[in-house]
Amino acid sequence: MNLYDLRRTHFSSKTVDTLQKVSKLLPKDAIFVNIGAYMESSTACILYGRPDIVAYSIDIEQCQDGLDNLEKLGLSAVRLLGTSQDHGRKWDSEIDMVYIDGDHSYESVKEDIELWVPWVKKNGFIAFHDYGTPHTPGVAKAIDEFVEEYGYPLFLKDGWDEEDVLRIYRVG
């Protein structure tokens, strides 16, 4: 199995490449938090070729296929079971990148932003998945409000068809 095998499950090759670009910009021993781990595709993209990065994967239940994906690639992450909000309320250290792809309701995305964005270091990254997908309108609304409130510039985006699925912002 290689990293691009993941695209056949959840990610396009463009998404894999985009996350790999950002991974290379993270500092040595970076802290990465993945909200909504499921198949661990985003975690794998960030960790692949960067064994120094410490990854925390948050999800409400254990997905054995996701753990198997990481193991097959020789990667590992600290798995935190429960909601991102529960873990966010207890979190107490800075992070270099947060990837928000958990509960796709407007309220949950907004709460993830409120709980996790303050922990992102200057020059760190905030990534959102499923922006612009018709079945998750709350995601785009929460992200648009985030951009208006914080003013962080769009760093990278990608998508398929007419949808801008992945949006990454850099903390100024």
Give residue ranges: language-model regions.
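A short alpha-helical cap/connector motif
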Residues: 1-172
